[in-house]
């Protein structure tokens, strides 16, 4: 599928309106504080970028960031402003045409930002070892609707875990299905290029993440995807797809389930862009100044990561009270509020 994807994104598509679906289009509004950063990106870079939304977790100042499937470099140039002069951003992509756009504007952005902290490499996201990147060299790894295009997602997650520093995270948006797709759908080149044919069944993805050390995958946000192209909808039948953002932490001590140790945290309100509340994931919106009960895993995700200075921690692991209330299974995504977009994107 590599050649097919390279052709689709390098030659067939010229801008996002050429796509046939809104798969991997993030319907959530972009935070106001990010919009000025996006306006600093060169127009050609933005025009040749086929994703929607922006994959940017909080608190990136000084971080070393890796973008998997960086395309024309739009997200990299936004992230460059967030990590600042003391941080760095590396984009990896397999499509020569996209990399040419990204590299053509390195000097433009360095002059605009006042520092040069972005670089791009040609490579495959499932074969990062060939780029000779050192173990534990990144604080954060991001990806915007690209992992579904990889024919070897197992290797992508294994390499991401290897490259993250302890306490680091893989923060990414992608497309997931509510079932395992038939072979003929997974081999369909148009469906694959539109980010649908390569979509994992959500439960298979979570098992895969756990197998590679990401013990407690956290869903940040999600939206159902509308398949508005009638021919594609006919092929897909009753299969349903979701655009979802996950964060996967590389942390020792995480447990398979959310266990209750009587712990709590208090958010200090000190993270830039999150004065009133910090959103860890879909089920954890932590208001400033409020005592917020948490499970042991959430405690570690806050205490053993870059977020620790922004919280007060109450309790420890000395006493166990059983399973944390509300920890369960089932389809994690919302079935309502289907994604709609004025222009298609992937």
From Swiss-Prot:
It catalyses: arsenic triglutathione + [thioredoxin]-dithiol + S-adenosyl-L-methionine + 2 H2O = methylarsonous acid + [thioredoxin]-disulfide + 3 glutathione + S-adenosyl-L-homocysteine + H(+); arsenic triglutathione + 2 [thioredoxin]-dithiol + 2 S-adenosyl-L-methionine + H2O = dimethylarsinous acid + 2 [thioredoxin]-disulfide + 3 glutathione + 2 S-adenosyl-L-homocysteine + 2 H(+); arsenic triglutathione + 3 [thioredoxin]-dithiol + 3 S-adenosyl-L-methionine = trimethylarsine + 3 [thioredoxin]-disulfide + 3 glutathione + 3 S-adenosyl-L-homocysteine + 3 H(+). Disruption phenotype: Deletion mutant cannot methylate arsenic and becomes more sensitive to As(III). It holds the Pfam family Methyltransf_31. Disulfide bonds: none annotated. Induction: Up-regulated by As(III). This is Arsenite methyltransferase. GO terms for biological process: response to arsenic-containing substance. It is an enzyme of class 2 (transferase). The gene is arsM. Optimum pH is 7.5. Keywords: Arsenical resistance, S-adenosyl-L-methionine, Transferase. Could be exploited in bioremediation of arsenic-contaminated environments. Catalyzes the transfer of a methyl group from AdoMet to arsenite, producing methylated arsenicals. Involved in the conversion of As(III) to dimethylarsenate as the main product in the medium and also produces dimethylarsine and trimethylarsine gases. Reduces the arsenic toxicity in the cell and may contribute to the global arsenic cycling. Belongs to the methyltransferase superfamily. Arsenite methyltransferase family. Its EC number is 2.1.1.137. It comes from Aquipseudomonas alcaligenes (strain ATCC 14909 / DSM 50342 / CCUG 1425 / JCM 20561 / NBRC 14159 / NCIMB 9945 / NCTC 10367 / 1577) (Pseudomonas alcaligenes). The keyword S-adenosyl-L-methionine applies. The keyword S-adenosyl-L-methionine applies. One of its GO terms (molecular function) is arsenite methyltransferase activity.
């Amino acid at each position: 599928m590599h050649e097919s994807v390279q052709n689709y994104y390098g030659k067939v598509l010229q801008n996002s309106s050429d796509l046939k679906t809104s798969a991997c289009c993030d319907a959530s509004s972009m935070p106001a504080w990010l919009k000025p950063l996006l306006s600093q990106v060169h127009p050609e870079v933005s025009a040749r970028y086929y994703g929607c939304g922006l994959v940017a977790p909080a608190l990136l100042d000084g971080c070393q960031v890796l973008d998997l499937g960086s395309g024309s470099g739009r997200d990299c140039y936004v992230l460059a402003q967030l990590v600042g002069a003391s941080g760095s951003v590396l984009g990896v992509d397999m499509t020569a045409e996209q990399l040419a756009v990204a590299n053509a504007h390195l000097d433009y952005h360095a002059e605009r930002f006042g520092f040069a902290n972005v670089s791009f490499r040609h490579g495959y996201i499932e074969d990062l070892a060939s780029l000779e990147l050192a173990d534990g060299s990144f604080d954060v790894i991001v990806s915007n609707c690209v992992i579904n295009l990889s024919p070897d997602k197992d290797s992508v997650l294994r390499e991401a875990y290897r490259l993250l520093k302890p306490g680091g995270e893989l923060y990414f948006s992608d497309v997931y299905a509510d079932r395992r797709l038939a072979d003929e759908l997974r081999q369909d080149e148009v469906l694959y290029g539109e980010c649908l044919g390569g979509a994992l069944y959500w439960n298979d993805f979570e098992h895969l993440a756990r197998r590679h050390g990401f013990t407690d995958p956290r869903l940040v946000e999600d939206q159902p995807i509308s398949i508005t192209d009638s021919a594609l909808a006919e092929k897909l039948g009753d299969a349903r797809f979701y655009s979802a953002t996950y964060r996967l932490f590389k942390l020792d001590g995480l447990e398979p389930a959310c266990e209750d140790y009587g712990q709590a945290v208090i958010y200090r309100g000190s993270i830039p862009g999150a004065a009133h509340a910090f959103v860890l994931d879909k089920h954890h919106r932590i208001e400033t100044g409020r005592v917020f009960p948490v499970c042991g895993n959430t405690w570690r995700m806050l205490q053993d990561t870059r977020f620790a200075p922004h919280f007060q921690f109450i309790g420890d692991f000395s006493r166990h009270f059983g399973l944390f209330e509300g920890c369960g299974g089932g389809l994690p995504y919302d079935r309502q509020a289907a994604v709609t977009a004025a222009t298609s994107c992937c």
